[in-house]
């Protein structure tokens, strides 16, 4: 899957949401068990605008993503919470890292909008502690119940990939 859509806010900000096949390969075990499976990475990029993006905009994005996933029954959505600065991350009097802010936002949005879906979805959160970056990084897989047997494999692939990248630095 390779598609994207633009979201233009009332304030004129432009956000581009892309969905692209995440792994050009899927581990042999996953491929043998679920030959039609596609893991799709979600990328959200703000192309213009400087004011904080309202929750209703993120809500619209989440609704579209859930709709796309529902239309593609052999799809697992993947999201890595990036470290781009520029977002407000104050919550209850404490400062959150960009990663933690995005992690909480992603969890909240998909819990809310996946509950409106006709299917049951599970959000698998993966925490990766980086001593080099001195912070915790987060990734998520959003998957259907039929894909739950893959959780450990997916988690291990992300953690092993993260470890190999961390070891190179």
Q: Where are the regions a protein language model picked out?
A:
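Non-catalytic substrate-recognition and accessory regions of acyl/acetyltransferase enzymes
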Residues: 1-169
């Amino acid at each position: 899957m390779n598609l994207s859509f633009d979201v233009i806010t009332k304030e004129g900000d432009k956000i581009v949401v892309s969905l692209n096949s995440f792994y050009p390969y899927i581990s042999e075990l996953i491929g043998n068990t679920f030959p039609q499976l596609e893991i799709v990475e979600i990328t959200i990029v703000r192309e213009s605008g400087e004011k904080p993006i309202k929750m209703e905009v993120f809500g619209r994005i989440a609704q579209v993503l859930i709709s796309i996933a529902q239309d593609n029954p052999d799809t697992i959505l993947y999201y890595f919470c990036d470290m781009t600065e520029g977002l407000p991350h104050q919550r209850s009097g404490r400062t959150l890292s960009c990663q933690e802010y995005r992690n909480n936002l992603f969890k909240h949005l998909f819990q809310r909008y996946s509950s409106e879906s006709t299917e049951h979805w599970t959000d698998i959160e993966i925490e990766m502690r980086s001593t080099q970056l001195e912070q915790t990084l987060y990734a998520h897989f959003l998957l259907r119940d039929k894909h739950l047997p893959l959780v450990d494999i997916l988690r291990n692939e992300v953690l092993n990939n993260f470890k190999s990248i961390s070891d190179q630095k």
